[in-house]
Regions:
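Cofactor-binding loop segments of dinucleotide-utilizing enzymes, especially the Rossmann-like FAD-
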Residues: 6, 82, 105, 228-231
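Acidic, Mg2+-coordinating active-site environments of NTP-dependent enzymes
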Residues: 11-13, 17-21, 40-197, 202, ...
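Active-site beta-alpha connecting loops in nucleotide-dependent enzymes
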Residues: 182, 206-235
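Conserved coil-to-alpha-helix start sites within the AMP-binding
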Residues: 29-38
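Phosphate-centric recognition/catalysis
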Residues: 26
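Short beta-strand-centered segment that lines the nucleotide-binding/catalytic pocket of NTP-utilizing
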Residues: 1-11
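Loop/turn-to-beta-strand initiation segments
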Residues: 1, 22-23
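Loop/helix-junction capping segments adjacent to catalytic residues or to phosphate/diphosphate-binding pockets
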Residues: 33, 89, 152, 205-206, ...
């Protein structure tokens, strides 16, 4: 597929790649509202936070942009919304178009994350799938080298889309297991004197909180130091 991403993808050492298939995968940028001009077939809404308020007039304005984006998805497509996020949960209730699935650790999720296990090398989880008018499905032992609950949620979003478009479970598991990640997304840079050094782009309070929660789960009992670089006065 053609790929356009906000960060450098480690496997291709670039933010973009021109593919040869009819598929395009891109990261939509909501910072200036331009994402509503993208015509998605499948969309993923990870979370919505009080950000980019230099452009949006209010939180209601921000929410309305996301509602507009979600409702642009055609009937032959689908939106995937993480309902662990409070604002996403509010938006779901306001959608006129019910053409979406939900995911997360929230018990009402269509793609429900179960049995999370953390270690330094991999995160493992199970996935219970409960879709309208379909038989329940349970996928065990999905592994990803990415750490933190936010990366599990992101992985599940990718799994949900992949299953919906007909990619097999073995292919999905293999793809996640071998995913090299994106630069500055909790990347391990090096180790020195038994100390591991990671780099992460998180600069919004919510993002920083989520990353640190992931670190605490993986490195229980270890001393941890966080060095924060302030970025933009609006954040």
């Amino acid at each position: 597929p053609t790929i356009i991403n906000g960060g450098v993808i480690n496997s291709i050492q670039n933010t973009a790649k021109l593919g040869k298939s009819e598929w395009s995968i891109l990261e939509a940028d909501e910072s200036d509202g331009s994402f509503v001009h993208i015509p998605p077939t499948y969309s993923i809404i990870t979370n919505i936070d009080r950000e980019h308020m230099d452009f949006y007039k209010s939180m209601d304005d921000l929410k309305n942009y996301f509602i507009q984006f979600i409702e642009k998805v055609p009937s032959f497509g689908k939106s995937f919304i993480c309902i662990d996020d409070k604002i996403n949960n509010d938006i779901v209730k306001k959608l006129k178009n019910q053409n979406f699935y939900t995911y997360g650790i929230h018990p009402n999720s269509n793609f429900l994350i179960k049995n999370i296990k953390h270690n330094k090398k991999f995160t493992e989880f199970d996935l219970m799938i409960n879709l309208p008018n379909k038989k329940k499905e349970y996928i065990k032992k999905i592994k990803t080298p990415l750490l933190g609950i936010h990366n599990i949620r992101n992985s599940v979003a990718a799994v949900a889309v992949a299953l919906t478009v007909g990619i097999s479970i073995p292919e999905i598991k293999n793809g996640l297991l071998n995913f090299k990640g994106v630069q500055r997304r909790f990347n391990k840079i090096f180790s020195y004197n038994n100390i591991d050094f990671y780099d992460d782009y998180a600069h919004h309070p919510t993002e920083i909180k989520v990353v640190l929660e992931g670190v605490n789960k993986v490195y229980k009992g270890y001393d941890k130091v966080c060095i924060f670089q302030p970025h933009r006065i609006s954040r």
